[in-house]
UniProtKB/Swiss-Prot annotation:
The keyword Amino-acid biosynthesis does not apply. GO terms for cellular component: cytosol. Pfam families: Gly_radical. Acts as a radical domain for damaged PFL and possibly other radical proteins. It comes from the Bacteria. This is Autonomous glycyl radical cofactor. GO terms for molecular function: formate C-acetyltransferase activity. The modification Glycine radical is found at G100. Residues 5-125 form the Glycine radical domain. Keywords: Organic radical. NCBIfam families: spare_glycyl. It comes from Aliivibrio fischeri (strain ATCC 700601 / ES114). PANTHER family: FORMATE ACETYLTRANSFERASE, FORMATE ACETYLTRANSFERASE 1.
Length: 125
């Protein structure tokens, strides 16, 4: 388990007010920030911190889920895309986001255009 601490009192003055992530499973300490003596991201054995007093620091740990979420934001009206399918000559510069890439709507196949419309506009969340 990883916990965050700020050292408030220590025999080693370099540790004073430094912030650390303690990994109890590996018995390691990772420096988040220190004014002297330690570098950010430096990993040492937890025992090297010596005796100290500390306060807990809230930490946020990023989820380790593969895949995650992806959001493409297109700010436009459904009618605009539907009209672009019917009259592509009126929308030569219409650009949308698809899978993280900017693409001209007219360069997509009709099937892809309809898929974009279906996925972009929903009745409710």
């Amino acid at each position: 388990m990883i916990t965050g601490i700020q050292i408030t009192k220590a025999a080693n003055d370099d540790l004073l007010n430094s912030i650390w992530l303690l990994d109890s499973e590996k018995n390691e300490a990772r420096c988040v920030v220190a004014t002297a003596g330690f570098e950010a991201d430096q990993v040492i054995a937890a025992s090297e911190l010596g005796e100290y007093e500390s306060r807990d620091v809230a930490i946020e740990k990023a989820p380790k889920i593969e895949g995650g979420q992806h959001l493409n934001v297109n700010v436009l009206q459904r009618d605009t895309l539907e009209d672009a399918v019917k009259h592509p000559e009126n929308y030569p510069q219409l650009t949308i986001r698809v899978s993280g890439y900017a693409v001209r709507f007219n360069s997509l196949t009709t099937e892809q255009q309809k898929d974009v419309i279906a996925r972009t506009f929903t009745e409710s969340l």
